[in-house]
Structure formats: structure tokens, C-alpha cells
Curated annotation (Swiss-Prot):
It comes from the Bacteria. GO terms for molecular function: ATP binding; dTMP kinase activity. The lineage of its organism: Bacteria, Pseudomonadati, Pseudomonadota, Betaproteobacteria, Burkholderiales. It comes from Paracidovorax citrulli (strain AAC00-1). Phosphorylation of dTMP to form dTDP in both de novo and salvage pathways of dTTP synthesis. ATP binds at G12, I13, D14, G15, A16, G17, K18, S19. This is Thymidylate kinase.
Length: 221
């Protein structure tokens, strides 16, 4: 019998540390015999990676940003995410639609009703026999105060167009994530990212065991 596919997203502001934990989760799943696809947004396909480069480096308004993001997302869903789920794989994605509502919606102040329309159009018609919107099964939200995140990023490397935004922008983004989590508490799991990496890793593995993603008998290290 084919195992259930899982679509798990990792969300948080720049500097929250989410990306550093994705490979550890992938390794834990592979030890249990699961096939894992690790991907990211913006990006995940050749077309979407090209759009990512434009998004991070070229000036554009909030509507253009949103259209670019959702164009890449549609290609990513059709080419990578939906087929992997049909095969029963676990998809681990570094950011997804919640980031669009947080960055373009809350951060840029773009109309969230328009984002919701784009979400419905882009993420539907991907599952056989239904026009339902495809959402993650679980979203891991790495919650960190914007001031702390900014201090972590300072001097790390040349910032992209988003990382270079003032801390007030990231306060709005962080609130956008909090609003999304409050609206869908069954899907979101919050992690306190203002802790040492191993403590965050322990939180993460406990959540994955509790949600049934990982075998509860497996060690989380």
C-alpha cells in the first residue's frame, strides 16, 4: 500500500534559521525509508529559479512581485510538488504561500484579497478529481523577533532586495505570519527560534513526532 504524501513548509522571516533545519528533517525521514523532495520558494524549477533571481534583485512594485511569485509557484506545483505527493513522497519546502501573504501582503501592504484570488487560481486543479486548493499539510513557523533576526544577518553576506529592508518591514512581515498562524492553527506549528540551534531542533523533532510525520520511536537527534 502506498504511503501518504506529506507537504511540509518551513516559514519565518529572514534570519530565523529555518533553512538550516530542513536537511536534518530530510535525513530523519530518509532513515525511516521515506522518499523526500527538498525544494524552495521562490524557486524549485529552472523557470521558477530564473524568476527568483529577478524577484530578489530587480526593483518592482508589490503587484508585480506577487504575480512573479505566483507564476513561479504554479510551475513549481505542477512540475515538482504535486507529482511528488502523488508518488507518496514527503515534500519539504523552504517557504510557500504563507510567505507571500507575510511579505507582499503584510510587509508591502498589498491587497490580501487579491493574494487570496491568486492563491485559489494558482493552487487549484492540481489534484485528480478535485478543484480544491492545494495547501501544505503542516507549516513549521520559526518565530523570531525581527531585531534579533537582523542582528543574526548583519555582516553575514551581501543582502538581497528583501534582506536589505528596514527592521520595520520585518515587524510587519512577522505580524503577517502571526496572523496566518492564528487563522489556521491546525496547520501551523510555532517554534521559538530565539534559542540555540539544538533546542530548536529538539522542538522541531517533537512536533514531527506528535503530528505523525516521524515515527515516535525514532530519536530526534
Amino acid at each position: 500500500m502506498q504511503r501518504r504524501g506529506w507537504f511540509i513548509t518551513f516559514e519565518g522571516i529572514d534570519g530565523a534559521g529555518k533553512s538550516s533545519h530542513i536537511e536534518a528533517v530530510a535525513e530523519a525521514l530518509r532513515r525511516e525509508g521515506r522518499t523526500v523532495t527538498v525544494t524552495r520558494e521562490p524557486g524549485g524549477t529552472p523557470l521558477a529559479e530564473t524568476l527568483r533571481s529577478l524577484l530578489l534583485n530587480e526593483a518592482m512594485d508589490a503587484l508585480t512581485e506577487s504575480l512573479v511569485v505566483f507564476a513561479g509557484r504554479r510551475d513549481h506545483l505542477r512540475s515538482v510538488i504535486a507529482p511528488a505527493l502523488v508518488r507518496g513522497e514527503v515534500v519539504l519546502c523552504d517557504r510557500f504561500t504563507d510567505a507571500t501573504f507575510a511579505y507582499q501582503g503584510a510587509g508591502r501592504g498589498f491587497d490580501r484579497a487579491v493574494l487570496a484570488q491568486l492563491e485559489r487560481i494558482t493552487q487549484s486543479g492540481l489534484q485528480e478529481g478535485t478543484d480544491a486548493v492545494l495547501h501544505p499539510h503542516l507549516t513549521l513557523w520559526f518565530d523570531l523577533a525581527p531585531d534579533v533576526a537582523a542582528a543574526r544577518l548583519e555582516g553575514a553576506r551581501a543582502p538581497d532586495r528583501f534582506e536589505a529592508q528596514p527592521v520595520e518591514f520585518f515587524r510587519r512581515v512577522a505580524q503577517g505570519y502571526a496572523d496566518r498562524a492564528a487563522a489556521d492553527p491546525g496547520r501551523f506549528a510555532r517554534l521559538d527560534a530565539d534559542q540555540p540551534r539544538e533546542a530548536v531542533r529538539a522542538q522541531l523533532m517533537e512536533i514531527l513526532h506528535r503530528r505523525g510525520v516521524l515515527d515516535a520511536a525514532q530519536e530526534g537527534g
